[in-house]
Structure formats: structure tokens, C-alpha cells
Amino acid sequence: MAEAQEKYQHQFQSQSPPFPTQEWVQFFPSPSPKSPAGTATTTTSSTKKDEKVKYMISTDPSLLSLSALDSAFTQEYMYWVKPLPAPVLKDMIDRSLCFGVYRCSHSNIANDNGNVGVEVDIDTDADPATARNMDATTNLTQIGFARLITDNVTFAYLTDVYILPEYQGTGLGSWLLQCVNAWVDGRGEYFRRFMMVTVGERAEGYYQRVMGVETQGRKGDVFIMGKKGKGAVV
């Protein structure tokens, strides 16, 4: 009996979270040539006015840039977070289902992503295994992120959603939430509930419209929102 329990415990501890990688690709208008601070930036020759830019959303954790997340976590637009030590940040990523948003560009194009966008360097910043899915002439610049805390069976909580300010207003934020929604709506018969928290009535209306969530409670300007899954009883 003891041997059986020990074997079961070992097998349980060795299992990694069952998060199959999903990817979405879409084209959006090129971002404004203005930086978040309003300082003019130089538009590259490859990004002309009204030109569509290729973006990718992926749940592959090996694509994520920890330095991009660390930079974003220090910005005022992520007012609900504080910077984390690198080992803690990595642990957070490893324990979550993360949606990275990336701008796709050729390697001979300079990064015009402002002061908080960080290119994913296959050799240093991201997992070298990433190279298996990337063209040799393609760079991915991480410009957004969302994170689900989930057991992958009954519950999911959405947090740390952002798109860099210079990329907002192009539809990328709504697309990111739609991709998260696709994952949530694709859960099985035992999935009970999706939850999130946001601040302000404007954000409340936005999430209601894009994700179909309902307000479950409110304290001041803080809204608790969510929606039932297929396995919800109450």
C-alpha cells in the first residue's frame, strides 16, 4: 500500500500542466508613430501609412520575454502590479496559462517599439527551442500579454492583461480578449466559472461587450466579473 501511494505521489508531482499550445495570427493597422510620451519616433521604411502589420498570439511559454514583462510591470498603465524578482516572475509564468502578443517583423528591420517593447532574442531571452517554429528572418516583438490562473478543468481567473500604449486603438486588445474567450468557451463539461477583476465603469462595459462577462459584485470602482461554464451548478 505504501509503495503504491509513493508511486502515485511521484507520478502526480512529475506531471506538467496540460496546456496545449495554441496560436492565432491576424493583420492589424500599423501603430501610431508617436511614443507613449508623445515624442515623435521614426517610422521604418517597411511600415507605411495604412499598411497592415502581422501579429501573433501564442500560449507557448518559450516565446515569452521575461525582460519585456519586467519592463511592462514597472509602467503606470499596469497600476495593479509591482515588479517581481526574475525567479519569482519565471515561477509565475510556469504556473499560469499565458497569452503572449507579438508583432512579427523581419530581422533586418529596426525595432520601433518605444521604450518598453523588448524583442525576443532566441539566443538569450526566450527558450532556444522557439527556433523550431520561426523563420530565420523573422523577429517577434512582445507587445502585449494576458494570464490565466487555472486548473484547466473547472476554473480560470484572468489577470495581467495589457497592450503597450503605442499599439492601443488598433483592435489588438479586443483580439487578445477574444482569443482568451475562445480558450474559455472551449473548456469541457466540468468547467464551472471564469472570473476577473477590473476597475472603472468604462472597463466594465468593455469586458461585458467583448467577453460576455457579467458583473458579480462591486466595491467602489472595482468590479468583480465572470461568466458560467458548462459545468456550473450555481
Each model region followed by its residue ranges:
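Eukaryotic short linear interaction motifs
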Residues: 108-109, 165-167, 204-205
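Conserved acetyl-CoA-binding loop-helix of GNAT-fold acetyltransferases
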Residues: 163, 169-184, 209
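Conserved active-site alpha-helix within GNAT-family acetyltransferase domains
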Residues: 185-230
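Short amphipathic alpha-helix that is part of the acyltransferase structural core
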Residues: 4-84, 111-117, 124-125
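Short alpha-helical
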Residues: 64, 153, 201-202
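Amphipathic alpha-helical interface elements that mediate macromolecular binding in regulatory proteins
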Residues: 67, 71, 174-178, 205
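A conserved beta-strand-loop-helix scaffold within acyl/acetyltransferase catalytic domains
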Residues: 86-107, 114-117, 121, 127-165
